[in-house]
Regions:
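Short loop/turn segments that flank or connect secondary-structure elements
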Residues: 1-273
Length: 273
């Protein structure tokens, strides 16, 4: 039995999946979690619903720990983005461009790995309450000001969250190989051993499953980036078809949120969890 976190659904529940081949690559098999992609999760940062992953720091959201960089391309994109930030965009620009910089050495999976520097308890790119430019990720806010997708300026792990992509080569019975890409929810377990210790995490909280659109639509740019345009178009068509038929394994957090939002016949809201 999985550990229960107050206000969140359990980690283990039924999910529906679909597998299809990349229209542009017959050796690329994509497995997509329809339960997650058809959920109504949405980012609730900056609202009372966001409690933060670290107790006592709700204004950090999920930015308390800094972001590990995935590769050289990830760092190059971040470096280019930093060059576009001004003092009006980034509260700690003087610190980030100072002697200690905006990156620091750490370890990931037992190997050396750069991550964004923590400053005053959170990622150095996180603008805090009271900053004239507003709270939140300086990179994200700058992208919106420029009219570009945030994924073009933020580290990979930041713009992909809470989409989890994993890949592995698998050998079929005839000894041929295909690359299998799995697209699913980045839940607490995605954070590793420390995931269970997070003060709060949004994907399991019904209060974050109040989006106007399902995840496959609200995260269309991100999914297109990780899968490619044609593969995403195929996935989106399948999601729309599945939604029309009725999903069997609805995400439990979405189900609770919808139940709360549906009045009973006498106009009284149903009880929560």
């Amino acid at each position: 039995m999985t550990e229960v976190h107050p206000g969140e659904v359990e980690l283990d529940f039924a999910r529906e999946w679909v597998e299809f081949y990349d229209p542009e690559d017959a050796t690329h098999l994509i497995a997509a979690d329809m339960t997650w992609l058809l959920s109504r999760w949405t980012c609730v940062f900056g609202t009372p619903a966001c409690k933060g992953t670290v107790e006592g720091r709700p204004d950090d959201g999920c930015c308390s720990h800094g972001a590990f960089l995935s590769d050289d391309d990830d760092r190059a994109r971040l470096d280019d983005a930093v060059k576009q930030l001004t003092d009006e965009d980034w509260q700690f620009r003087d610190k980030g461009l100072g002697r200690k910089g905006y990156l620091e050495d750490d370890e990931y999976d037992g190997k050396p790995n750069l991550r964004t520097r923590k400053y005053k308890g959170a990622c150095i790119f996180l603008n805090r309450p009271g900053f004239a430019g507003g709270i939140g990720c300086a990179l994200h806010s700058k992208a919106l000001k420029l009219g570009v997708e945030p994924l073009t300026m933020k580290p990979d792990v930041c713009w992909q969250l809470p989409i989890r992509r994993s890949q592995e080569w698998i050998t079929r019975p005839d000894d041929t190989q295909v690359l299998r890409t799995v697209i699913t929810e980045y839940d607490r377990r995605g954070w590793g051993e420390g995931g269970a210790d997070l003060h709060w995490y949004c994907t399991g909280d019904p209060n974050a499953h109040v989006g106007a659109r399902p995840v496959f639509e609200s995260y269309a740019p991100e999914l297109t980036e990780v899968l490619g345009e044609k593969a995403y178009a195929e996935l989106a068509a399948m999601c729309r078809r599945r939604s029309g038929l009725g999903l069997v394994a609805v995400h439990p957090a979405t189900r609770v949120a919808e139940h709360r939002a549906t009045p009973t016949s006498n106009g009284v809201q149903p009880s929560s969890l």
